[in-house]
């Protein structure tokens, strides 16, 4: 259900703006998206796990907040980020 250290490191390398960048909004959104995808898969087999569903909602809200921050500060970064993550249709 949680992401492995190797997968997290790969996401950091892929979305980092500079070498060693772990805290930029792009990296945070990528990690949150991976966790959201994992939880979504979890709910396909554990539909009544309401405790984890609350955690999923918190992750989605945190990601939305970070995406709003990126959108307000740099629309080009926002557009490229959602395209890379495949979040919007």
From Swiss-Prot:
SMART domains documented for this protein: Ribosomal_S15 (SM01387)
UniProt key word rRNA-binding: yes
GO cellular component terms attached to this protein's record: cytosolic small ribosomal subunit
A Pfam family matched in the record: Ribosomal_S15
PROSITE patterns hit by this protein: RIBOSOMAL_S15
Gene3D superfamilies according to UniProt: 6.10.250.3130, S15/NS1, RNA-binding
Domain of life: Bacteria
Keywords: Ribonucleoprotein, Ribosomal protein, RNA-binding, rRNA-binding
InterPro entries: Ribosomal_uS15 (IPR000589), Ribosomal_uS15_bac-type (IPR005290), uS15_NS1_RNA-bd_sf (IPR009068)
GO biological process, any: translation
Gene Ontology terms, MF aspect: rRNA binding; structural constituent of ribosome
Complex and partners: Part of the 30S ribosomal subunit. Forms a bridge to the 50S subunit in the 70S ribosome, contacting the 23S rRNA.
HAMAP family: Ribosomal_uS15_B
Stated family: Belongs to the universal ribosomal protein uS15 family.
Function: One of the primary rRNA binding proteins, it binds directly to 16S rRNA where it helps nucleate assembly of the platform of the 30S subunit by binding and bridging several RNA helices of the 16S rRNA.
Protein name: Small ribosomal subunit protein uS15
Organism name: Zymomonas mobilis subsp. mobilis (strain ATCC 31821 / ZM4 / CP4)
Lineage: Bacteria, Pseudomonadati, Pseudomonadota, Alphaproteobacteria, Sphingomonadales
């Amino acid at each position: 259900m949680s992401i492995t250290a190797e997968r997290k490191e790969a996401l950091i390398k892929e979305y980092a703006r500079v070498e060693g960048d772990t805290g930029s909004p792009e990296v945070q959104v990528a990690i949150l998206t991976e966790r959201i995808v994992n939880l979504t898969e979890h709910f396909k087999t554990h539909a009544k796990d309401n405790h984890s569903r609350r955690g999923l909602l918190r992750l989605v809200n945190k990601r939305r907040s970070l995406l709003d921050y990126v959108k307000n500060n740099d629309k080009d970064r926002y557009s490229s980020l959602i395209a890379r993550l495949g979040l919007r249709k």
